[in-house]
A protein has these predicted regions:
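Conserved helix/coil segment N-terminal to the catalytic DExD/H
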Residues: 88-115, 129, 133-134
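Conserved RecA-like helicase motor-core motifs
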Residues: 80-90
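Post-DEXD/H (motif II) to motif III coupling segment of the RecA-like Helicase ATP-binding lobe
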Residues: 126-160
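Walker B catalytic acidic pair
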Residues: 122-123
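Conserved Walker A/P-loop ATP-binding site and its immediately adjacent core
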Residues: 51, 58-78
């Protein structure tokens, strides 16, 4: 089952947020997916990060992001050690690795082709870019999940 959360407020500020019903529904669907590539569209502010950090892991997970804040933001939501591949940060066999796309494209040889069972792409509308395709084609994960609020922002190109 998934981790459960209690929403805690202090001085009108949300300190911890729980999974919403629609996030749980997305997680239930992902649990039953066959191997392949899938796109999850959730509107801005609906908690894509909270959702993808709660996906059940069956092997190592790679999360790709194009900006520093998107690399560091998910760390607090994972219930396991998280490695970072960005600038002067390097991972060390953690169950989850969050990587800057620009950094990882120059470090692919550090990893085996079958290193990651699942790749999650944050802001997946960027995934048609050559740098993303280089990473995806290098690893060929069992499950490739893209999360975005705006799937049609880029031209209609596949990210696989």
């Amino acid at each position: 089952m998934y981790r459960t959360y209690t929403t805690i407020f202090k001085g009108g500020i949300c300190l911890e947020m729980g999974l919403r019903d629609y996030q749980q529904e997305v997680l239930n669907i992902i649990d039953n997916l066959e191997p392949g590539a899938y796109l999850v569209q959730m509107a801005t502010g609906l908690g894509k990060t909270m959702t993808f950090t709660n996906i059940k892991r069956k092997g190592r997970v790679l999360v790709l992001a194009h900006r520093e804040e998107l690399v560091t933001q998910p760390i607090k939501y994972y219930d396991c050690p998280v490695g970072i591949e960005m600038a002067n940060h390097t991972s060390n066999n953690e169950p989850v690795v969050i990587a800057s796309v620009m950094s990882l494209t120059h470090r692919l040889e550090k990893f085996k082709h079958d290193e990651f069972d699942m790749i999650i792409i944050d802001e997946a509308h960027h995934a048609a870019a050559t740098s993303y395709k280089k990473i995806i084609n290098y690893f060929k994960p069992r499950l490739l999940l893209g999360f975005t609020a705006t799937p049609n922002r880029r031209r209609q190109r596949s990210f696989r």
